[in-house]
Regions:
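C-terminal helical cap(s) of enzyme catalytic domains, especially alpha/beta-barrels
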Residues: 55-63, 191-202, 253-280
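N-terminal amphipathic alpha-helix/helix-capping segment at the start of soluble metabolic enzymes
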Residues: 1-25, 77-86
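Basic/polar phosphate-binding segments, predominantly the helix-turn-helix DNA-binding elements
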Residues: 308-338, 361-383
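…primarily DNA-binding HTH/wHTH and HhH modules…
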Residues: 374-398
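Catalytic cores of alpha/beta
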Residues: 29-37, 100-108, 165-174, 227-244
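Glycine-rich phosphate-binding active-site loops on the catalytic face of alpha/beta enzymes
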Residues: 42-54, 116-127, 178-192, 242-263
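Active-site beta->alpha loop and helix N-cap motifs at the rims of alpha/beta catalytic domains
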Residues: 31, 38, 42, 58-141
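Terminal helix-turn-helix DNA-binding modules in bacterial transcription factors
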Residues: 296, 328-365, 389-398
């Protein structure tokens, strides 16, 4: 077990050195082991993670197929804690469980070796008539707030999943250590959500909630969970446009990588020795999601001329389909995304101070400096020379 003080010190140090944190909702001991080897800052034992490893959807943790708390306790004590005794592992607590006494159960969680608690499954993800019926029966979000307040009192690290400002405010007043904006089920893969908000909508939600956090308790760590953000590029976008300090993933780290690795490996073995076929299947198996492919291509080649119709040909889809799909997932047109990305990268290069304004323009895909300056001012609110001059003055007068 990692103590509260030690864990908080570790996370603060990581934020200072690396700038961001990564939490992993591990559904098995194997996932947890490799997550920690990869540099995860903490693990979460959640019943939904266990169901994912069984090949079921994450929301299975919300139904009465079994006791969520019992499933989580077994996952943590039989798989995660024995092989990762020095890792910070958080317990996903179903606070509305009618068969537990919150205070006594939290003491048991701590005694079994867990370093902290998160409110999951959370009623925050339920709405409509079913939510009203649950609340009439006493299953309210305030119960989760109470649970994390008690956990904090007992010296457990606390992660609060929230979906709107009112929930974040209540959790901040309860003294939680992390506010994590839950953006819904993770998109992608065979079992991923087919309906989800765009990355631009996610940005707006995070910005509202995190702005509240900064005003109320700036020391509280601000993180994001899942939804449309399932690639490093998505998370990088949210880091650049919101005050987010970290990312927690479940399917992103255990289901999607496992789906891809198993599928690709079996196909490769299935077609081993079949001349001329292996390459075809390998290419098909590794074909990325169209929108992810476009975003990755922009990331790697933003300084070149990029046309959506050319990318559509490579992906074997129509330009109109790719354009519509891209806007649905990102909340912006391809042209707006490309321009925004180019201007963000240009600003970063200008702030580094090693290149002239014209050199930065050329690296950003602009041979006409006047056009580059015009677009930069439109997207960044200042001219390239203003940024460059500011960096020169800063270096001369540290």
């Amino acid at each position: 077990m990692v103590s509260y003080t030690v864990l908080l010190q570790r996370l603060r140090a990581q934020l200072h050195i690396n700038g961001h944190l990564v939490g992993v909702a591990a559904g098995s001991g194997m996932t947890g082991t490799y997550a920690m080897m990869g540099g995860a800052d903490f693990l979460l034992a959640l019943s939904s993670g266990r169901y994912r490893i069984m090949g079921r959807g994450s929301y299975a943790g919300y139904y009465c197929y079994g006791s969520s708390n019992d499933i989580t306790m077994e996952l943590g004590t039989r798989e995660l804690l024995p092989i990762l005794p020095d890792a910070p592992i958080l317990f996903g607590l179903a606070a509305s469980d009618p068969f537990i006494h919150l205070y006594e159960y939290l003491k048991e969680i701590k005694a079994r070796g867990f370093s902290g608690v998160a409110n999951f499954p959370t009623i925050a993800l339920i709405d409509g008539q079913f939510r009203l019926a649950l609340e009439e029966d006493g299953n309210v979000y305030e119960r989760e707030v109470e649970a994390l307040a008690l956990a904090h009192h007992l010296g457990l690290f606390t992660v609060a999943f929230v979906t709107r400002e009112e929930e974040a405010e209540a959790m901040l007043r309860a003294g939680v250590d992390v506010i994590c904006v839950h953006l819904g089920l993770t998109k992608g893969g065979f079992m991923g959500a087919k309906k989800y908000i765009s990355i631009a909508e996610a940005q707006q939600i995070c910005d509202r909630i995190f702005s509240l956090c900064v005003r109320m308790r700036p020391e509280a760590i601000r993180m994001i969970y899942a939804g449309p953000a399932n690639t490093p590029l998505d998370v990088d976008y949210l880091y650049r446009h919101t005050p987010a300090q970290g990312y927690i993933g479940g399917s992103t780290f255990d289901r999607i990588p496992a789906e891809q690795a198993i599928l690709h490996t079996i196909r490769a073995f299935k077609n081993a020795g079949r001349s001329g076929v292996s390459e075809t299947f390998a290419t098909e198996a590794h074909a990325p999601d169209a929108v992810d492919f476009v975003k990755q291509y922009v990331h790697e080649h933003y300084g070149r001329e990029i046309r959506l119709r050319d990318l559509a040909i490579v992906l074997h889809v129509s330009p109109s389909y790719l354009s519509t799909r891209f806007k649905q997932e990102t909340g912006m047109s391809f042209t707006a995304f490309l321009l925004s990305y180019r201007m963000e990268r240009a600003r970063a290069l200008l702030e580094e101070g090693r290149l002239s304004c014209k050199e930065v323009a050329a690296r950003s895909g602009y041979l006409d400096y006047a056009q580059f300056s015009k677009m930069f001012r439109k997207y960044q609110g200042v001219s390239p020379r203003d940024i460059r001059s500011s960096e020169i003055n800063t270096s001369r007068n540290p």
